[in-house]
Each structure stands twice: as structure tokens, then as C-alpha cells.
Swiss-Prot record:
One of its GO terms (molecular function) is phosphatase activity. InterPro entries: Phosphatase_YcdX_put, PHP_dom, PHP_phosphatase, Pol/His_phosphatase_N, Pol/histidinol_Pase-like. This is Probable phosphatase YPO2037/y2275/YP_1880. Belongs to the PHP family. NCBIfam families: PRK09248.1. Its cofactor is Zn(2+).
């Protein structure tokens, strides 16, 4: 069991079903110490408005011993790697995930998908690429793993990709984990929970990690401190309220 979950959605993304309060309650039950709310970026049809992300400053940092990070799952928009988290929004979030979503960036061929993903990492704002193993978006796996290591970006193992979404992802996810291992990069684990009961569920991710013998010291979710240190190393300000997690 990992004590950190880095990818989940609330009712602010209207195809999800839980509130911030629901996630806090579930985290306490499961001994999750830190989680990031990462609702979809505003270019998605049912995503929160820009103001939602700007107003996350009203959230508490710590509730009943559970740390809360203000995040976004932004959309990769084009081959230049542009995303729908820009300007003041970049300073409003602690954690910036970005990935491909069909309503914003329709699937392309392998070369174009790879170009867009690497360009997104190269822009320097994104911390994690979400569900890079999606078979609808084939990529050059060694190339993206090497780019992720170069730009200090984590690639995600997304538990939902094995259970509910993006059917056929497993072989790609296994290959990505092995490529990140060989490149010396970071893995991030995300439940991609759309309902609080799925918070912290990483059973499929854990199986892949074991199968490829991925080193625990290169997984961001191992402890709150590891994730917070990574974000600070990437230039995010320290969060004093979470210092003791």
C-alpha cells in the first residue's frame, strides 16, 4: 500500500462522483497520508471553469492528518506540447499532470503522439504524464522514457487503465515501466479515481512494478516527503503545513 495518490477527480469534473470531503474520509480509512485532486483542465467539455482552479487556495492543506495537494490533469492540445494550464493557473496548482484526451487532441500516429508528449515535457511545467500507455495513442516508448528522465518528468502507471478505461493498456504499461527503469526516471502511481472508494487502489500498478523489478526509490508515491521533495526540486514552493507528513 502506497500512502500517496496523485490522480483523482471530484464532482467538479461532472463525470466523477465524489467530493473533496469524501476523499478525505476515504483517505483516513485507508491510511492515505497525501493526495492530489487533479480535475480535468478546462478544455474538456465537462471540466471545471478556470476560476475553480484559481480558487483552490481556499482549500485547507491538512485535514485530520491528511494532506491535500491542489492539482490539475491538463490536456495536451497540439504537437507543440501546449496545455490548457497557463498563466496564473500555473502558480495556482501544486501538481501538474498532463495527458492525451480524445475530445481535445484526437489520436494521431506514433510519430505525432510521441512528438506532442515530448514537447509537453520539454516545456518544463508538467510534473507527470498521465496514462501514457493508452493504446489509442501509440508512442515510441524508449523515446518518451528517455525524454522523461531528461526533463525530470514522471510517467504514470494508472490503475484505472487496467480496470475501467483504456482497455488494452497493460502491455504498454509494462513496457513503459521497464523503459523508465532503464532510463533512470520516475514513476508516479495514480488511481485515477472517479469515485472515492477507488482512492489509493494500486493493485494492478503494484503487479507491473513487481514484474519489471522497478526500484522503489524511483516511485514518487513511496512517501509524502519524497513527493514533496520532488516538487520542490522542480521549483514548486515548499508547503509548510505538510512538512511533518
Amino acid at each position: 500500500m502506497y500512502p500517496v495518490d496523485l490522480h483523482m477527480h471530484t464532482v467538479a469534473s461532472t463525470h466523477a462522483y465524489s467530493t473533496l470531503h469524501d476523499y478525505i474520509a476515504e483517505a483516513k480509512l485507508k491510511n492515505i497520508k497525501l493526495f492530489a485532486i487533479t480535475d480535468h483542465g478546462p478544455d474538456m467539455a465537462d471540466a471545471p471553469h478556470y476560476w475553480h482552479f484559481m480558487n483552490m487556495r481556499v482549500w485547507p492543506r491538512l485535514v485530520d492528518g491528511v494532506g491535500i495537494l491542489r492539482g490539475i490533469e491538463a490536456n495536451i492540445k497540439n504537437l507543440d506540447g501546449d496545455i490548457d494550464c497557463t498563466g496564473p493557473m500555473l502558480d495556482a496548482v501544486d501538481l501538474l499532470i498532463a495527458g492525451f484526451h480524445e475530445p481535445v487532441f484526437p489520436p494521431q500516429d506514433k510519430a505525432a503522439n510521441t512528438q506532442a508528449m515530448i514537447a509537453t515535457m520539454a516545456q518544463g511545467n508538467v510534473h507527470i504524464i498521465s496514462h501514457p500507455g493508452n493504446p489509442k495513442y501509440p508512442v515510441d516508448i524508449p523515446a518518451i522514457a528517455q525524454a522523461a528522465a531528461k526533463y525530470n518528468v514522471a510517467l504514470e502507471l494508472n490503475n484505472s487503465s487496467f480496470a475501467h478505461s483504456r482497455k488494452g493498456s497493460e502491455a504498454n504499461c509494462r513496457a513503459i515501466a521497464a523503459a523508465v527503469r532503464d532510463a533512470g526516471g520516475w514513476l508516479a502511481l495514480g488511481s485515477d479515481s472517479h469515485i472515492a472508494y477507488a482512492l489509493g487502489i494500486f493493485e494492478h500498478c503494484e503487479r507491473i512494478i513487481a514484474e519489471v523489478n522497478f526500484p522503489q526509490e524511483r516511485i514518487l508515491n513511496v512517501s509524502p516527503r519524497r513527493l514533496l521533495d520532488y516538487l520542490e526540486q522542480r521549483g514548486r514552493p515548499a508547503i509548510p503545513e505538510l512538512a511533518e507528513l
